[in-house]
Amino acid sequence: TLFRSRKNGPYPYVKGAADEDKYNRSLSEICEEVDVNNMDMFISIHSNAASEGSNTNYPVYIYRGTDTEDYAPGSKAMATTNWKHHWESVLDPQSYYGIDKPNIRGDISFYGSSSTRHGTKGDYTGYLGVLKHGVPGFLLEGYFHTYQPSRHRALNQDWCRQEGIRVARGVCEYFGLKPETKGYIMGTVKDLHEKIVHSLYHYVPKTDDQWLPINGAKVNLLKDGTVVKTYQVDNNYNGIFVFNDLQPGKYTFQVEKEGYKPLFGDDDITVEVKANETSYAQLHVEATNYVPPVVLYHNYDEPAIDGMTLAPTQLEFAQESATLTLEG
C-alpha cells in the first residue's frame, strides 16, 4: 500500500506557513507514480460539501468514465463491491441512498464534462485529475463535512480509522483476500435528556445527533462481567468510542463520568461482536442533577352530563292550520 496524496509535511498543519506546500502534490505527479508502479487498485478518500450546516449527508463513489462505462476497467465493480461495506447509518445519519441503493457514478456523467491528460504511459480522458491514469479504482466522498455532527465525529481519529477499515473490507472481498477473524465496536455516549444547542451544531431532527455528547467520559468494555478494554472519549463533542481487535462474543459497557449516573434501563445493553464486522452501540447516561419535568396542571375527567341535556334520539313533527284575514 502506498499513500500518495501528501508529502511528509509538518505537523500540525499551519495554513499560510512557509512549508505549507510540502503537504500538496500535483495530481499529474500522483497519476504518473500510480502508472509507473503498476498498482492493482487506486483509492482517493475525501469528504464532501454542501451548504454549511445543511443536513445533506451520504457517500458517493466516483470512477473515471461514464455511468455506463468505466474507462479503467474494473473500477465500477470495485466501487460496487466496496459500497455495502462502507455504508454506515447507525451513528452517522444518511439523508439519501442506502446499503441496497448505491450512489456510484462515472466522473464524466457526474460532472458533465471531461478533458484528457497525456501521460508517459498513455492518454487518459476523464474529469477528475486524480483519476487520470490507467489503474482501476475510485474516488470516495465518504460523508459531508458540512453536516456538522459528522464533522465533529471526523475530529476523532478512531472514527476515521473505522472508515478506512470498512473500505479495506471491500478491497478484501473484491480480491478474494482472507477476512479478519476479529471484530470491532464503535459507539457514542450521550446525555439521556439534554439536547445540544449551538449554532455550529445543526443536526437532523429526531436522530441521535440531537443529544449532547458526553465529553471526557470513560467507557469500559466488559466480557463476562470483567473489564477487558477502556476508552477515553475526547472533548470534541462527538461522544465517539471505539474498541479494536475483539474476539467474537457478547460484551457489555460501563460509563464513568462525574455528574452522571451509571447506565440503566434500555441503555444497559449487550452487543454481539462478529468476525470482520463492526458492531454499533448508542449509550445514554442520565445526569445526577436531572429533575423530571414538573406537572403544572392536571387534565380532569369530563363531568357527567345530565340526561336532559343529551341530544334527542327522536323528533316528532305536527302540522297546524290557521285562517288569516287580509285587510284592504
Q: PLM features: residue spans?
A:
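Periplasmic peptidoglycan-binding/tethering modules of Gram-negative envelope proteins
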Residues: 288-328
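Catalytic-core regions of hydrolytic enzymes
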Residues: 1-57, 61-73
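Structural motif
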Residues: 180, 188-214, 299-302
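A short, amphipathic beta-strand motif
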Residues: 183-192, 283, 293-294
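Active-site-adjacent mobile loop/cap segments within catalytic or ligand-binding domains
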Residues: 44-52, 62-63, 98-179
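A short, solvent-exposed beta-strand micro-motif common in secreted/extracellular proteins
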Residues: 239, 249-259
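Short, acidic Ser/Thr/Gly-rich low-complexity loop/linker segments typical of extracellular
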Residues: 208-215, 222-240
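Structured interaction patches on ligand/partner-binding surfaces of diverse proteins
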Residues: 258-290
